[in-house]
UniProtKB/Swiss-Prot annotation:
GO molecular function, one term: structural constituent of ribosome
PANTHER family: 60S RIBOSOMAL PROTEIN L32 AND DNA-DIRECTED RNA POLYMERASE II, SUBUNIT N, RIBOSOMAL PROTEIN L32
SMART domains: Ribosomal_L32e (SM01393)
Keywords: Ribonucleoprotein, Ribosomal protein
Similarity section: Belongs to the eukaryotic ribosomal protein eL32 family.
InterPro entries reported in the protein's UniProt record: Ribosomal_eL32 (IPR001515), Ribosomal_eL32_arc (IPR023654), Ribosomal_eL32_CS (IPR018263), Ribosomal_eL32_sf (IPR036351)
Protein known as: Large ribosomal subunit protein eL32
GO BP terms in the entry: translation
CDD domains: Ribosomal_L32_L32e
SUPFAM superfamilies membership: Ribosomal protein L32e
GO cellular component, one term: cytosolic large ribosomal subunit
Amino acid sequence: MSEFKRLMRLKLKMKQKRPEFKRQDSHRFQRIGTMWRRPTGHHSGQRIQVTYRLSPVKIGFRGPALVRGLHPSGLEDIIVNNVKQLAALNPKTQGARIASAVGTRKRIEIVKKANELGIRVFNVSKQKQGEFLSL
């Protein structure tokens, strides 16, 4: 088993054990979102790290450095806006994610070109890719 595969498996296990970092009192008030904010209150149980409160973000929860930030498939996630940017990708180490601002017509062109070059597109389902390729 290669070191890379071992680290990817370790990353997955660590992710499963990692707690969900939520903003303090986000379950009590609808106006407060769940996105993490560091608690700053003087008597805040979460800030003091009382056992029964939610866990705060700590450096020990990070994943292995070599595979940090990679897609679960092990490929580097690159945002693509046009076909030119797609040509610059390496299909063995990088995958494409089509930017949200890209319209349907250009999205179809990108998916077709990615299929020709053998590049994986992360945010287009296999079913949708089949529809795009048949057009």
